[in-house]
Amino acid sequence: MRTRNFVYALSLLACMTSSVLAKDMNLPVVSKGFQHEFWQTVKMGTEAAAKELGDKTSYVGPADETQIAEQIQLVETAMAQKPNGLLLAALDANALAPLVETANSRGIKVVTFDSGVNSDIPVSFVATNNRKAGAEAADALAAEVGSKGKVGIIAHVAGTSSAIERSEGFIARMKEKYPDIQVLPVQYSDGDPQKAMDKTIDMIQANPDIAGIYGTNEGSTLGVANAI
């Protein structure tokens, strides 16, 4: 996982470098935060990639993945530096879209990663195929529960594209291939392990016959694991 995330970060900066066709660039990164190992590893990979490419970067993020207003402020601060480009993992696909438009109007190229925005402005989007990931999670969980029974979803942040797409991919695959599996309504944990654990406990108490639960990100999965 750590190696993959280093490669992921390198591809982000390489993508931006090829997009703006310059060297010695300033390419700030606004992530979703620092609270999960994933983001810590992406930070290290970003810094390593910038060094390798000869570019300057900074890495910031909000206190947690619910702080949309804080992330907006961080993006505004980054744009005020007049960078060559900006890399953004958006907490909310709609709320961050206007800032991407603003960046573009100022000549700042934007690459989104992990979770994008509802805009065609970004020059590239670097991420896993979240719907496919959700579908593959559905196949794996269906195999574990014998393709029948109730299953739940503990997703991370409502409004973020990765949570939406992973959940949609999971639900669509269950409907398509596993008619004997009932998917319970999605519950959101804000990516917080404690909240995810509490949501999981509530789900199990309300559905004592539940067969399995899908956690859509690191924090959600840790919470589910702690609960069961």
Predicted feature descriptions by range:
Residues L21-I228:
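A residue-level marker of the well-folded mature domains of exported/periplasmic proteins
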Residues Y8-S18:
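Bacterial N-terminal signal peptides
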Residues M1-N5:
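Positively charged n-region of N-terminal signal peptides that target proteins for export
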